[in-house]
Each structure stands twice: as structure tokens, then as C-alpha cells.
Curated annotation (Swiss-Prot):
CDD domains xref list: CAS_like
Keyword vocabulary terms for this entry: Acetylation, Carnitine biosynthesis, Dioxygenase, Iron, Metal-binding, Mitochondrion, Oxidoreductase, Transit peptide
Descriptive protein name: Trimethyllysine dioxygenase, mitochondrial
Pfam families for this protein: GBBH-like_N, TauD
Annotated gene: TMLHE
Native organism: Bos taurus
Pathway assigned in UniProt: Amine and polyamine biosynthesis; carnitine biosynthesis
Length: 421
């Protein structure tokens, strides 16, 4: 009896694999005794498209353009782009997701040219272009980066000879703005030259690409070494490499620097590509990279100078990555503002110190340091989520102005110009 049933099952499977059966429902009583759950298989192939799909009990599997993708049925119903489910004018969902049966399955599926049609139990039809599914599948997104970047050390950046953009070209032409943003997105830093050395013109420059992010330091900040704020930046001391506002829950995205005047020596700006250093850690000690991406740390800013009373706390790991493609998108590194480590047990702490030391060594390698002397008329934009900055000590009177920009608005401007961001 068992031999007969298994032989029959094997025969039916061979028929399916030869393409003789396009729909096979294992619902007969003799099969139910072999399998506790009914299994539905749908198999359609298009040689011209190299497309194969199968309908499983709990998901839809698609093989297309050398990719194997799997889609949950609720997901397929939820992302329907029909007129009743999606407003194409506002690009917003109209369907009430909570109304979708969590056990929903399509009644029929068929392929017409490059479009898949799903007919649901209530008769509603959802259609998907194969390329749209590939682009928006988890498997497709896992292979893509959100923002292409060129990682650099001092030699790589200098050999690239990335040009600065002229002030007037930046303000008056889309091409100048696009070239600037392309350089900024790729390298995490970019320069604008021939800027009148005033706070007003620096502000005008910043507003060309983004809203200015007002913080506890104001909208546009102007500082010298008078220690008017409770921060080491307001001194003549050297500053080690760091990212700013790690004590914000969302650190400021972009920083703008313009040296309006310097009557003295020293004061060069240090720039280090934090993503380049992190990549070295990933290659040499992947387990330490992973630890730095998982251990949450507190950063703190306490100020009690004159009328400036602030107590800011931000929490997050040193390295922040997207979970689906492991792409690094933010480094939160500031040894000045790191608070007490009390967010992990003792047996993790020492491993974290070891990993942090590995990253610090990479960040401090002389070959990774790019030094630049900021002068009146030359404005520097820094991706504060990627590039660390510091400075050497200086003498004499030095005036700087600048601001922070909202990251979302900078990326918005870039996308509207056709850049990937």
C-alpha cells in the first residue's frame, strides 16, 4: 500500500516537473494521509522572459531575471496599485491595510506579457509589472545600496581631484548645484569657492540646497575662541576627529563651515572618511564591526554658561546600518561627548572597548587624514553622518560662521535633480 501511494506521488511529481501539470492540488484523501496540509503548486514559464513562478500555501515565489523572490500574500494585496487602492496623484495608499484578511490567498494568478494578475477572493484584481516586483522585492533591495559612495583616504581623495564649485554657478545654475551635490554624495565633503566672506552670503549658500536646522546653537552660528559656549570648539585648542551632535537623538546631517577671518597660524581642518575606516574594520575584524553596530551608547551635552542652560542626551550605536543590505549610513563617534557606558552588561563592555580601539586606530592612521586650510571665500560642506572633522590648535584671532542643514532636505534636493540619494 505504501509503495503504491509513494509510486503514485513520484509519478505526479515527474509530470509536474515535465510541465504536464500546471496546477496540482494535493487534496485527494490518499495524499492527505501523507501530508497534514494541502499544498498548491502553480508553475508558469515564459522562455522569452525567463520567468517562472509558483504559488505556495503561504507565499508567492517568482524567478525572474536571474533572481528568486518571495512575496507574502498580504503584501501583494496591500501594495495593489489599482485606482481604488492607491492614489496615483498623491502617491498615497487608499486601501485600509487593517481590512485585509491576514490569511488571504489569490484565487487565480496568470501572466500576460510582462504583467502578473492576481485575482482575490472578493473578485478584486491586482496587477504587477515584473520589473516593479523585482525592484521592490526584499531580495532585490538586499542587493542594492541606497546611496552610492566612493570611500577615500587622503591619497584617494587628492588623486580624484574633486573640483570645487564657483559661488555664482552654485547659486544660479542647476548644473552647478547638481555637480556640487554629486560630489557631496560620493565623497561626503564638498567645497564652494569665491563666496563673499560674510555670514549673510554663507546663509544664502546654505539655503540653496536645504532648510537650515536650528539647534541650541541657533540658526546660523558665529564663533571665535572666546569660550562663549560650554564647548571645546570655542577655544584655540586642537580638536581630535569627531562627528557633531552625537548627543541628539538624530545627529545633524550636514555641517557648513566658513572661515571669515584668521589673523594667526595653525587652525587647519582635519577630515577623515569614517566609512572608509569602518570598511577596514569590517574587512579585518567583522565581529568587531558587528559589535559596534549593535551596542547602544549614550552621548551627553551639559552646558551651564551664562544664559545657556542645556542637557542633551542622544542614544545609538557607533555604527548604524540598514538591516536588509548591511549598508552603513551613520557613524556616531565623539569621545568628548560619550557619556557613561551603562547600557550593556560587563562582559560586553570589554569587547566593545576592543572594537572601539580597532576603529580608532583606523581613524587615526596618518594616511587617512586629509588636512585643509579654510580661508575666507572657501566654504566647506561636511556629511556629519559620515566624515569626521577636527582641527589643529591655532594662534591669533579666528572667526568662523556656519550652520547645520536638515539631511532630509539636502537629499530631497539631490533626488529632484535626478541623483540617487
Amino acid at each position: 500500500m505504501w509503495c503504491h501511494r509513494l509510486s503514485h506521488l513520484q509519478s505526479r511529481l515527474q509530470d509536474l516537473l515535465r510541465g504536464r501539470v500546471t496546477r496540482w492540488a494535493l487534496q485527494q484523501s490518499n495524499f492527505k494521509s501523507l501530508f497534514p496540509l494541502a499544498i498548491y503548486w502553480h508553475h508558469t514559464a515564459s522562455k522569452s522572459l525567463n520567468c517562472v513562478w509558483q504559488q505556495h500555501e503561504d507565499h508567492f515565489e517568482l524567478q525572474y531575471a536571474n533572481n528568486v523572490m518571495r512575496f507574502d500574500y498580504v503584501w501583494l494585496r496591500d501594495h495593489c496599485r489599482s485606482a481604488s487602492c492607491y492614489n496615483s496623484k498623491t502617491h498615497q495608499r487608499s486601501l485600509d491595510t487593517a481590512s485585509v484578511d491576514l490569511c488571504i490567498q489569490p484565487q487565480t494568478i496568470h501572466l500576460d506579457e510582462t504583467t502578473l494578475f492576481f485575482t482575490w477572493p472578493d473578485g478584486h484584481v491586482t496587477r504587477y509589472d515584473l520589473d516593479w516586483l523585482m525592484k521592490n522585492s526584499y531580495e532585490g533591495q538586499k542587493q542594492k545600496v541606497i546611496q552610492p559612495r566612493i570611500l577615500w583616504n587622503a591619497e584617494i581623495y587628492q588623486q580624484a581631484q574633486v573640483p570645487a564649485v564657483d559661488f555664482q554657478t552654485f547659486l544660479e545654475t542647476k548644473e552647478g548645484l547638481k555637480n556640487f551635490l554629486q560630489n557631496f554624495l560620493l565623497y561626503g565633503i564638498a567645497f564652494v569657492e569665491n563666496v563673499p566672506p560674510t555670514q549673510k552670503h554663507t546663509e544664502k549658500l546654505a539655503e540653496r540646497i536645504s532648510l537650515i536646522r536650528e539647534t541650541i546653537y541657533g540658526r546660523m552660528w558665529f564663533f571665535t575662541s572666546d569660550f562663549s559656549r560650554g564647548d571645546t570648539a570655542y577655544t584655540k585648542l586642537a580638536l581630535d576627529r569627531h562627528t557633531d551632535t552625537t548627543y541628539f537623538q538624530e545627529p545633524c546631517g550636514i555641517q557648513v563651515f566658513h572661515c571669515l577671518k584668521h589673523e594667526g597660524t595653525g587652525g587647519r581642518t582635519l577630515l577623515v572618511d569614517g566609512f572608509y575606516a569602518a570598511e577596514q574594520v569590517l574587512q579585518k575584524a567583522p565581529e568587531e564591526f558587528e559589535l559596534l553596530s549593535k551596542v547602544p551608547l549614550k552621548h551627553e551635552y551639559i552646558e551651564n554658561v551664562g544664559e545657556c542652560q542645556n542637557h542633551m542626551i542622544g542614544v545609538g550605536p557607533v555604527l548604524n546600518i540598514y538591516p536588509w543590505n548591511k549598508e552603513l549610513y551613520l557613524i556616531r563617534y565623539n569621545n568628548y561627548d560619550r557619556a557613561v557606558i551603562n547600557t550593556v552588561p560587563y562582559d560586553v563592555v570589554h569587547r566593545w572597548y576592543t572594537a572601539h580601539r580597532t576603529l580608532t586606530r583606523e581613524l587615526r592612521r596618518p594616511e587617512n587624514e586629509f588636512w585643509v586650510k579654510l580661508k575666507p571665500g572657501k566654504v566647506l560642506f561636511i556629511d556629519n553622518w559620515r566624515v569626521l572633522h577636527g582641527r589643529e590648535s591655532f594662534t591669533g584671532y579666528r572667526q568662523l560662521c556656519g550652520c547645520y542643514l536638515t539631511r532630509d532636505d539636502v537629499l530631497n534636493t539631490a533626488r529632484l535633480l535626478g541623483l540617487q540619494a
